[in-house]
Amino acid sequence: PCFESADELSLKRKILLKQGKPPIYDRTALRLKKSEIQSLIQSGKRPHWRLKLDDETIEWSDMIHGKIIFSNLSVSDPVVFRSDEMPLFTITSVVDDADTEVSHVFRGDDHITNTAAQIKLFKLIDAKIPEFGHFPLIKSISGQGLSKRSDDFSVRKFRKQKVSQLVLINYLQKIGTNQSFENIDDMKTLYKNFNINNFSKNSVFFDPNDIERINSKYLKNLEIKT
């Protein structure tokens, strides 16, 4: 059980960063005595709960990045339950994946740290660990991460621009690979040619101008055929 407020944790993080140190949780809560914990709870403070990571080195063969070795000492003990007793993604996804026997997990490489903690959780509940693959994040041409709050890359915007659904699907499947955007494949061909080994480990850039150019060429070819 941990009792630090969000402001207290934020201050600790800022101090560590200012000192040039990684913002790792200092495990203050581990030094609390049982009597102190009881006193804090009786005073009305509600704890959040962290999973204490041991000194074990976690490693896995990532389907995109290859072998990843992760030292638990380099990350904070993850919060698994909030102070309102609501479980967080780190633990709920593990329980759900184990229960439904998920075999493969693909997500962005900003989840690599989560994966290290979740592999530990899979081991703790004696569940089969799925295969993991972490895609590089897609960025805008300016190098910024894509935001759900921005309309620049929304499906709504592409629909208004009359972008073909097939063009957009082709672009999203081929971005970050060595496959040409110029060839617009049907869904069966896309499915047949999909290979996880084609994806780059490096960040990729989403250029709306490419979509517009490819779509224009695709629509012209359709007009010629008809």
Language model regions located:
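Catalytic adenosine-cofactor/nucleotide-binding cores of aminoacyl-tRNA synthetases and other
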Residues: 113, 125-226
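Active-site cores that bind ATP or allylic diphosphates and position pyrophosphate for catalysis
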Residues: 5-148, 154-158, 179
